[in-house]
Amino acid sequence: MRKWRIEDSAELYNINGWGLKYFSINDKGHVAVTPREGSASVDLKELMDELQVRDVTSPVLLRFPDILDNRIEKISKCFQQAADEYGYTAKNFIIYPIKVNQMRQVVEEIVSHGKKFNIGLEAGSKPELHAVLAINTDENSLIICNGYKDENYVELALLAQKMGRRIFLVVEKLNELRLIADISKRLKIRPNIGIRIKLASSGSGKWEESGGDGSKFGLNSSELLEALDFLEKAKMTDCLKLIHFHIGSQITKIRRIKNALKEASQFYVQLQNMGFHVEFVDIGGGLGVDYDGTRSSSSESSMNYSIQEYVNDSVSALVDACAKNNLPQPNIITESGRSLTAHHSVLVFEVLETTSLPIWDEKEELGENPHELVDELYKIWDNMNQPRLLESWHDALQIREEALDLFGLGLLDLSLIHISEPTRLQLI
């Protein structure tokens, strides 16, 4: 049998599937990182050797800021391409939820490089809002406030808005709307209000239950009507500027996204027809990362669509709904934090110990009068070739089962099981 090659490692670990050209195996058999296509690669083995010379030992977390920059550009270009294709004339805003990765260096890099791509930040609590206000000083950048809201959280957001920040308070419970109305009246400010709508559509994958009718957050249809009635009575209809939905993280099936977008588009149409001039539709997170490189929906670690397909469906759904109802196109907000940051860091740690499967020594002979099952298994291994590989594997499995049955009945010695095991494993 031939020796193991670099190509075999690339195929085994499917690095070309999940690496997205950021990660590859170089000619030395080492993992290489290429932050941008066409730029210089970093050999991780050589990098770690250099760090050890400097007395830096593993575990080490390596960050590649250029990958963050490239991911921002990738998503932005996908929206531009979709806008050109479907006639989308409004704006797209990319929002980074800092809960995804709160490391200062990460958030600063995203804010710095993302200025020309309408990058904003999302806060899910008062402490996160403090961090967002401190790190993102661009007055044209959007700040989305989600999560549980108490009086202090709402007051901080409204005071920041009074200072010129573009802040949107997204209502997830009816009592939050009343709280926002009371505090804004006291501070004499017209708040930018968003409403999170609880869609019937749900996502797919590990976080499927976080969306749909069973979701903990958002207003259902009856609660939405109650909220709209409250805004009308409070003469705050002009304050409702955003609707938001989120059907789960790491969505594996594009069909679920299509259904949610279709449903959300109708909510936008209905609100416009009721006299609420919503300017933004926040489609939330959910854009998946293909961790295993299979590009399938059968695994929670993958998804069956590309970023471009996700963006195309998002843009086309809203453009189509607006065209049919003669309505202005809304600005689209996305909160795809996972897709932005997943590839940019690598954790390198020391391998403490390894285990290996027993392998048949090619120089070893079976000896005289071997058991017929062992002899047959040896012949399968000795005569194995590529065209009959699967057939040989099936034959080996059958012999293995027969050997275990005989061993269980006391008709086969442990020594024979010992001989047959490395021969079978060699076939793998």
Residue ranges and their predicted role:
Residues 251-259, 290-307, 339-354:
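Short glycine/threonine-rich loop-to-helix capping motif typified by GTGT followed
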Residues 247-248, 281-291, 334-339:
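Glycine-rich beta-strand-to-loop/alpha-helix junction loops that act as flexible
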Residues 86-280, 289, 305-309, 322:
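Active-site-proximal beta-alpha core segment in soluble small-molecule metabolic enzymes
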Residues 340, 349-410:
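Polar, glycine-rich mid-to-C-terminal structural blocks
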